[in-house]
Amino acid sequence: MKIVVIGSGLAGLTAALTLARRKQDVLLLEQNEFLGGVTSGFEKDGFRWDYGQLNLEAAGEDEPVGQVLELLGLRKLLQIVPEQRDYIFPDFEIRTPAEYGGVKWRIEYLKQLFPAEAEGLERYWADYVRFTRLMTLARRMEKGGLGAKAAFYTSLLPLISKKDWTAEQLLAHYFTDEKLKAVFVSILADFFTPPSQFQGLGVFAINAERAYERRMPAQLARNAEMLGLYAVAGGMKELIRIYEVAIKAAGVSTRYNTTVTRIVVEHNQVSGVVDQDGKLYPCDCVVASGGAKETFFNLLDPAVLPEDFSARVKDIPLMDSVFMLHLGVDEAYPEVLRSTSTYFYGSYDIEGQVKQAQEGIYHEGKAGFVVHLPSLRSPAMAPKGKYAMTIYTICPEKLKSSNWEKDKEKYAAKLLDYAEKYLPGLRKHILTQVIVTPLDLRRITHLQHHAFGGIAPLLNSWRVPHQTPVQGLWFIGAQSESGGGMNAVIPASFKVAQKIADSQRR
């Protein structure tokens, strides 16, 4: 079967490689002159940066992403190292202790900070263990077996009363202190999702304890295994390089600087794609990644889609963007930056800050920012004795009363002002600097709206299914039903590719 894969982000690369390994005839079309999209990162003056804090979740040997990379023969070619995050709030810090404190260290530490919440923290922990067991059994259930299914549904019972709760409701069940609640939902700012609109049980997923302590074992309790957070030595560009070598060896044909302008459909069946020069590429199947609205409204004749499907695509909730300051520095601030990713929060009002960003109002760093220091694990990403550093904030994709291109220098200066409160004298240590705005990211991704992590994970929101109403057209990536994040798109794209290849046996 002749298959065209549109886009070479991790979703497209995974699908293309999987299909080629299954003996399909694959053509990969990439709009840029390089593979990987934003995952590829960039270089300047001997420094190399990723576009933000790109850690791989679930990339361990027996974890979902790790298993896919293993099946594709890629994992053994990568140096994947355990990672963790540190969190700095206005009144306290949550940092991995120098001496290992066990799987429950963070909960015990929070009891010291919030003694009145000790009973609620114990109840939270009991449900965290239950949720971890539920997710472990869900992964096992995918492999089949009545025993796994029975164990899964038995484990679901203690949590079923909370299945329709929001994160706001879930945390109110355990805690009264607003600062403590913020600890458990602060990462939702990155998702542009208010706690009042996020799945309650999802709080346990975004608080995987191994993300706070890389020495922690996977085994939490019987039938309860935690997923880990990892970094790829050399940065994400190394992962893309390994993929590039693999797809070439597998026989994938790749065309760079090729933008698809139309997907051809005849009698509700895909028959080819057309590029910016009007060249037709006949095919039996198209696997599209990237923007949902761009794919379904710009590349297809509106008449081929059911009206209700188009209406739903139009209303999918997307995240907004990020403002990034990439620095080459000669000081790593080891007393402050002890992990590759350190979150600095200026506010406990996660709900209010997300809603403000959704209204087009940029906090300029006042509400918080992230410092990513990949050189801590990957010294080769900077010249000897120097360090690659990225400071970034979430931000509106479009500003309400300003312009990204016109005011980017002003915003960069303001962000440095906030960063220097924690990293004194940072400006004196900057050797090179690159500002990246939502406009830059929009150009790289070929999107009309740059969504940092794809679709926003709002409670009960509809997602674009991988298998579309058009025969032979599949949709993958961060704006598809898989949701965003490499831990989501890599396994999902692998499964979609396997499903397409399996369909040829019938």
Annotate each PLM feature.
Residues 1-133:
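N-terminal glycine-rich phosphate/pyrophosphate-binding loop and immediately adjacent elements
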Residues 182-197, 366-372, 425-482:
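A glycine-rich dinucleotide-binding beta-alpha-beta segment and adjacent secondary-structure elements
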Residues 231-232, 259-382:
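Mid-domain catalytic core of redox enzymes
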Residues 53, 478-501:
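A conserved FAD-binding loop/helix module that cradles the flavin
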Residues 367-453:
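FAD-dependent oxidoreductase catalytic-site/capping-region signature
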Residues 247-260:
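A conserved beta-strand/loop element that lines the FAD pocket in flavoprotein oxidoreductases
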Residues 129-250, 448-456:
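Active-site/ligand-binding neighborhood in enzyme catalytic cores
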Residues 265, 438, 501-506:
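Active-site-proximal substrate-binding core of FAD-dependent oxidoreductases
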